[in-house]
Amino acid sequence: MNKIDAIEMEQMKKNIPGFRPGDTVKVQVKIVEGDKSRIQAFQGVVIGRQNGGIRESFTVRKISNGVGVERSFPLHSPSIDAIEVITRGQVRRAKLYYLRKLRGKASRIKEKKYVAGM
């Protein structure tokens, strides 16, 4: 391992849950306004993950007051306080950009079901 990889490994977060496109996540983001800071939640569907390693980012989409809002987050950013997986979605694509065109019930994602005891 070279020096660049070693520096990247120490800066990567360790407590990131495993999530995939189609999952509904709640991202707790630190917002700094002047000398005050607070945590703001952004909950929506993961529509894609890009790159890998320290450069990895993901995009979350939600509908707010009838308007689609997408926000991209660097996965290992210090401004992300926590990522919580709400539901697991069952999709067959890595990028869910087709959700941008869908409205209402058509934009729902099927929930993944787990069988316990197998």
Curated annotation (Swiss-Prot):
- Gene Ontology CC terms, in alphabetical order: cytosolic large ribosomal subunit
Q: Which InterPro entries match?
A: Ribosomal_bL19 (IPR001857), Ribosomal_bL19_CS (IPR018257), Ribosomal_bL19_sf (IPR038657), Translation_prot_SH3-like_sf (IPR008991)
Q: Which Pfam families match?
A: Ribosomal_L19
- Listed GO molecular functions? structural constituent of ribosome
GO biological process terms, semicolon-separated:
translation
Annotated Gene3D superfamilies = 2.30.30.790
**What are the alphabetically sorted keywords of the record?**
Ribonucleoprotein, Ribosomal protein
Function noted in UniProt: This protein is located at the 30S-50S ribosomal subunit interface and may play a role in the structure and function of the aminoacyl-tRNA binding site.
Q: Which NCBIfam families match?
A: rplS_bact
HAMAP family from the UniProt entry: Ribosomal_bL19
Q: What family does the database annotate? A: Belongs to the bacterial ribosomal protein bL19 family.
**What is the name attached to this protein's record?**
Large ribosomal subunit protein bL19
Query: Encoded by which gene?
Result: rplS
